[in-house]
Amino acid sequence: MENIISIVKKDLKEIAQKFNISKDPIVEINKNNIDSHFSTTLALMSAKELKQNPIQLAENIKNELLQKDYYDQIEIAGPGFINIKLKTELLSTTIKNITTLKEAYGKNKIKNKIINIEYVSANPTGFLHVGHARNAVTGSVLEEVLKFDGYEVQTEFYTNDAGNQINILAVTVFVHYLWALGIETEKPANTYGGTFYDDLANIMIQKYGDKFKNLTFTETAISDEETHQIFRKEAVQHFLTEIKQQLKDFGVVIDHYSSEQEMYDTNQIEKLLKEYKEKNATYEADGALWLKTTEFGDDKDRVLVKKDGSLTYIVPDLATHNIRIQRTHADVLINIWGGDHHGYIPRMRAGLQLLGHNPDILEIEMVQMVRLIKDGKEYKMSKRKGTAVWLVDIMEMVGKDALRYMLASKSSSSHMDLDLDLVQQKNATNPVYYAQYATARCHSILNQADQKNIKANLNVSNLLSNKKEVELLLTLDNFNQVIQMSAKNRAPQLICEYIQTVCKQFHSYYADTKILDENDVPTSEARLGLVLSVLQVLTNAFNIIGVSALETM
């Protein structure tokens, strides 16, 4: 079933082809003109190309449109804007489309393209913090948007379990282990903070007793190498399990977890360096091994292996991306990264191109910092201590739905202030409450209709005609366009913006209109169909962002 705006676009595209216009028509809901539904700038955009007067070209387009079945009135405004008014029966097909397709409404056809998204990828050194939460929401909502737009989507979590931070983690847990045994010792300044290390320390005592109590430690190592490896392995496994559970509680399930350590254990790093050498993509200088990234747009060549034989950060990153491309057969790789990675992108693309991959396969979406505000001040406290505000604490404070909604509501590329007091208010100033109240209101109306034995009419052609009904119908019809725009621009926040638009229009409509009128049952039945449509579209949108469409408040 085609939505209305797609029909208008298709008709205009046919006319454009007839007039040898190369540009694709842009069609928008006409919010400023109560006498028309859509507007297009096709004539204005194309007049110069065709060397025609834009008003005359607009008249020609108008005459072509009026030969179609769907258009009631076409007006030319200003220098060549075309305002389009539809026949009422076409408008009303929106309700039939929505109530027939239900949870599939807004979905696009299967595209036979695979997109692989890597997101969160937190170091397994502790709990998830609010920055990880924003990354998780950005990735999971984008995943659902892309699925809705017809893509096959795979998701990845890259586990940084091989670096020096894991050595520091092992020492951190070992110190807490000694403390739990009643042994007083000073914790190195570089180790991690948080009371959740006590939980793991107690688990280690249950499993191993006090057999390690006489060992010593430095900032990065336990004195016995075998014990050090035990603490590394146990800590990574513990916190990775914890991370998976916290993500699940937050509405995020990731398909595949890859391991940096596993790449070393299976000689993938050596294979990568060998492949670069075979492709003549490396050279030695100043005792180091360099990658020729300047050949493909980087501002300088990059060191792969330093003088002391140690690897630079880019080596495992290039290796995991090479493996990911080969394993997933994805058409596009999207990485959701922190904003501090921006300068890293050109060297990654160049490194992939030197392996023979299309550099455009890699897309990077940046997630900027989120600052929590409480009582008008920045909120930094956490009952689990440490240096961050933990996801589990914020969820306990405001709830999963409120946190997901607010984090999804702003572009991830901009810094964000999240007011914890605002999201707990039960009034229209709270966007989450305002949105969820709309679905609860729909359910309330449907329950009242049941009590009054009023049934929805989904086939009306002329009973939904007041300005606010038409406005709602056009906005509901536009859901698929919002999905396409959100997917194309990798902009999940557009879904929240759309939800707010629908809710604002619906609440305004409810305030001004007697939806259930026992003295006018036919109109009530038609309006009930509109309420069902609002509920379905909002439910679909809420499902995309992973927020509950509440039945009651």
Curated annotation (Swiss-Prot):
SUPFAM superfamilies on file: Anticodon-binding domain of a subclass of class I aminoacyl-tRNA synthetases, Arginyl-tRNA synthetase (ArgRS), N-terminal 'additional' domain, Nucleotidylyl transferase
Motif residue range(s): 'HIGH' region: 122-132
Protein localization: Cytoplasm
EC number: 6.1.1.19
Catalytic reaction annotation: tRNA(Arg) + L-arginine + ATP = L-arginyl-tRNA(Arg) + AMP + diphosphate
Single Gene Ontology MF annotation: arginine-tRNA ligase activity
Pfam families, A to Z: Arg_tRNA_synt_N (PF03485), DALR_1 (PF05746), tRNA-synt_1d (PF00750)
CDD domains: ArgRS_core
Record-linked InterPro entries: aa-tRNA-synth_I_CS, Arg-tRNA-ligase, Arg-tRNA-synth_N, Arg-tRNA-synth_N_sf, ArgRS_core, DALR_anticod-bd, Rossmann-like_a/b/a_fold, tRNAsynth_Ia_anticodon-bd
GO cellular component, one term: cytoplasm
Gene Ontology biological process terms from the UniProt entry: arginyl-tRNA aminoacylation
Top-rank EC class of the record's enzyme: ligase
Alphabetic keyword roster: Aminoacyl-tRNA synthetase, ATP-binding, Cytoplasm, Ligase, Nucleotide-binding, Protein biosynthesis
Gene3D superfamilies referenced in this protein's UniProt entry, alphabetically: Arginyl tRNA synthetase N-terminal domain, HUPs, Isoleucyl-tRNA Synthetase, Domain 1
Subunit structure of this chain's protein: Monomer.
Family assignment from sequence similarity: Belongs to the class-I aminoacyl-tRNA synthetase family.
Protein name: Arginine--tRNA ligase
Species assigned in the record: Mesoplasma florum (strain ATCC 33453 / NBRC 100688 / NCTC 11704 / L1)
